[in-house]
């Protein structure tokens, strides 16, 4: 998820 990627840092798909 793109949103989750942003929350994780900036890794889309994480």
Swiss-Prot record:
Gene Ontology CC: chloroplast thylakoid
Keywords assigned by UniProt, alphabetized: Chloroplast, Plastid, Thylakoid
Subcellular location: Plastid, Chloroplast thylakoid
Principal localisation: plastid
Note: On the 2D-gel the determined pI of this protein is: 6.3, its MW is: 21.3 kDa.
Record-given protein name: Unknown protein from spot 108 of 2D-PAGE of thylakoid
């Amino acid at each position: 998820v793109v949103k989750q990627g942003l929350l994780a840092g900036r890794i889309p798909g994480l």
